[in-house]
Every structure is written in structure tokens, then in C-alpha cells.
Swiss-Prot record:
NCBIfam families: trpD (TIGR01245)
UniProt-listed Pfam families: Glycos_trans_3N, Glycos_transf_3
Binding site for anthranilate 1: G80, N111
Organism: Legionella pneumophila (strain Lens)
Cofactor detail note: Binds 2 magnesium ions per monomer.
Binding site for Mg(2+) 2: D225, E226
InterPro entries: Anthranilate_Pribosyl_Tfrase, Glycosyl_Trfase_fam3, Glycosyl_Trfase_fam3_N_dom, Glycosyl_Trfase_fam3_N_dom_sf, Nuc_phospho_transferase
Gene name tied to this protein: trpD
Complex formation: Homodimer.
Gene Ontology annotations of biological process type: L-tryptophan biosynthetic process
The protein's role, per its UniProt record: Catalyzes the transfer of the phosphoribosyl group of 5-phosphorylribose-1-pyrophosphate (PRPP) to anthranilate to yield N-(5'-phosphoribosyl)-anthranilate (PRA).
Binding residues annotated for anthranilate 2, in chain numbering: R166
Alphabetically ordered keywords of this record: Amino-acid biosynthesis, Aromatic amino acid biosynthesis, Glycosyltransferase, Magnesium, Metal-binding, Transferase, Tryptophan biosynthesis
Annotated protein name in UniProt: Anthranilate phosphoribosyltransferase
Residues annotated as binding Mg(2+) 1: S92, E226
Length: 344
């Protein structure tokens, strides 16, 4: 599809067909489109609004172009779209250690920051984790720690063609929405945070279209792409072929309604400090938001568990020291694996 005709169609707010979307995404991901053309496409899609069919088609292309990794099942991913502009610490990354410590295998798909002050990869590298691991090393992490981090550029090399356009735009784009949909381990259960409640049903439907068994898509009424401690959060749950909408408030689970001020960060260093504080057992707003979002993943991953029980499992995983142990064990393991591969 020629860029000129694509842009005219989007300017007139006409949706793209699945075939058109696949063609355009392929052009963006193979170097056929220039940075200016990619940026124009992304900006016009944002103005028009991405549809279920467009996102499903785009995710299918991205999955086809990805370097896939088979880590077995069941697995869960906990991920946010970003783009909420709130600059909270890396809650989903913190939750990954808690959920793994609760005995659930986590394949955490993440990247460096594009639209926030601290992406999951920025934080982990600050802490000393090695992210560029081979498939067998990633499997080793899952086997020993129940958790592996899948560094997006390694699994989605085609994304390099859109990196400059995204960074120059500096705004939330289609790719924020796609990131949670293209986990290279092809997880079947996911907790996905989105930056606006307007996107809940759309993303849940796309996940269902892509073969998800169970998902929780979450957005808070104060604009976080996760369960908030400062407002009610809305959930669209997909399970057994059905969609269900429900709400979560911290007070419903014995947690304090708190301002977000205490969990806003300016850097990966600050985010790391908060995460280590939570995993060490410190109380406060950071712990509470990690408990709520970890519970969402435990609830999504386990059959027949209530949200109350899931919060208790998250609390135990922190208070018995296992979440902190997981953090330190995985960090050391990635460093050891990296040294071994460098000596081969």
C-alpha cells in the first residue's frame, strides 16, 4: 500500500482492513517505510484510533517476524502498555518477582523506556541483571527461578526499523498497544495494564483473537496502566470464552487508599530503590500497589482462586522473603550465565 494512499485513508478516518494493516506493518518492520513515513503512520493511527481488527492484524505480523522461544506452559506475563504519563515505579516488574515466588512461572516481556522515565530493562540493568541471554539461558532462568525476562529487541529485531520514529515522536503510539500482545514465549495467560479504560474491551478482545486462554486487562480511573492505590480500577476479564467486567478498590481488600506521590520516580535508580524496599518487606503505598497487581496475576494464573486469596499469597511471598530471594537469585544467575557464555 503506497504511503500517500495510506495517509489519505487515515486522514479521512477510514479504518484499515486486516490485509491493509498487515501490509503496512510489514512495510514498517522491514525498512520499506522511512522514519518520516513510519512516524506519520503512527501519528495518524493515534488520531483515528486503532481498532480490534487493526491491532489483531498488526500483532499477527509482529508475531510472525519475532524470534520465538518455547518455555513450556503454563506461563504468565504481567505487562503494561505504558503511555500513561504518570511515571510511577516499575510495578509490573516488581510483581514478577512476587508472582514467581508464589510458584507461578513468569515470562516477563519488556524493553527500555520509550515514553516513561524508567522502562523494565532500564531498571533491571541498573540492578545488575544481564538481559541479553540465549534461549537456553532464558530456559535456565525459568527452571531455577520461575522467572525470565525477555528483552524485546532480542526477540523483535524488526522493531529496530521503528525505533527512531517512536523516539522522535515521544508519544504513546500503536506500538505501546502491541507490546503486551507479542510476548515471544506465546504465553496464554496475561495481566495487561492499559493507559485508559476506553481500551479495556478492545485489548481483551484482541488477546482473545490471538488465542489467549485467560486475561485480565486493567486500567485505573486515575489513568494508571495498572491497579491503582489512589482510585477505583476497572477490569475486563476474559476466561472460558467469556468477558466479564468488574472493579477493584484497595479498601475492598483491607489496603489503604493512598496518593500516588509516594510511588512517582524520576529515574531507574529511584524505581529500583522502591522495588528493593517492597521486596525487603517495607510497608506503605509501594507495597500495597505491588500486592494488588501481583494478586491480579496470581488470580489469572491459578484455577479456582479468589482475589482475596491471591492477595494473601502475594503477601506471604513477600513476607517470607521468597520474593527478595528470587530477585537476588535471578540477578546472580544472569551474571553467572553471561560469564560462562563469554568463556566458551
Amino acid at each position: 500500500m503506497k504511503p500517500k494512499f495510506l495517509f489519505e485513508q487515515l486522514l479521512s478516518r477510514q479504518d484499515l482492513s486486516s490485509d491493509q494493516m498487515q501490509e503496512v506493518i510489514h512495510a514498517c518492520m522491514t525498512g520499506e517505510f522511512s522514519d518520516v513515513q513510519i512516524a506519520t503512520f503512527l501519528a495518524l493511527m493515534r488520531m483515528k484510533g486503532e481498532t480490534v481488527n487493526e491491532l489483531t492484524a498488526a500483532a499477527k505480523v509482529m508475531r510472525q517476524l519475532a524470534h520465538k522461544i518455547d518455555l513450556g506452559n503454563p506461563l504468565i506475563d504481567i505487562v503494561g502498555t505504558g503511555g500513561d504519563g504518570r511515571n510511577t515505579f516499575n510495578v509490573s516488574t516488581a510483581c514478577s518477582f512476587v508472582v514467581a515466588a508464589a510458584g507461578i512461572k513468569v515470562a516477563k516481556h519488556g524493553n527500555r523506556s520509550v515514553s516513561s522515565r524508567s522502562g523494565s530493562a532500564d531498571l533491571l540493568e541498573q540492578a545488575g541483571f544481564i538481559l541479553n541471554l540465549s534461549d537456553s539461558q532464558v530456559q535456565n532462568c525459568i527452571n531455577q527461578c520461575q522467572l525470565a525476562f525477555l528483552f524485546a529487541p532480542h526477540y523483535h529485531p524488526a522493531m529496530q526499523h521503528a525505533r527512531a520514529a517512536r523516539q522522535q515522536l515521544g508519544i504513546r503510539t500503536l506500538f505501546n498497544l502491541l507490546g503486551p500482545l507479542i510476548n515471544p514465549a506465546q504465553v496464554k495467560r496475561q495481566v495487561v495494564g492499559v493507559f485508559s479504560t476506553n481500551w479495556l474491551k478492545t485489548i481483551a478482545t484482541v488477546l482473545a483473537n490471538l488465542g489467549s486462554e485467560r486475561s485480565l486487562v486493567i486500567s485505573s480511573q486515575d489513568g494508571l496502566d495498572e491497579i491503582s492505590i489512589a482510585a477505583k480500577s476497572e477490569v475486563v476479564e476474559y476466561r472460558d470464552g467469556n468477558f466479564k467486567q468488574w472493579f477493584i478498590s484497595p479498601e475492598d481488600y483491607g489496603l489503604k487508599h493512598s496518593s500516588l506521590d509516594a510511588i512517582i520516580v524520576d529515574s531507574p535508580e529511584q524505581s529500583l530503590h522502591l522495588i528493593q524496599s517492597v521486596l525487603s518487606g517495607d510497608s506503605g503505598p509501594a507495597r500495597d500497589i505491588v500486592l494488588l497487581n501481583s494478586a491480579a496475576a496470581i488470580y489469572c494464573a491459578k484455577d479456582g482462586i479468589s482475589f482475596d486469596a491471591a492477595i494473601e499469597e502475594a503477601r506471604i511471598a513477600i513476607d517470607n522473603g521468597k520474593a527478595n530471594l528470587c530477585f537476588n537469585k535471578l540477578r546472580l544467575l544472569t551474571q553467572t550465565l553471561n560469564k560462562e557464555s563469554n568463556h566458551e
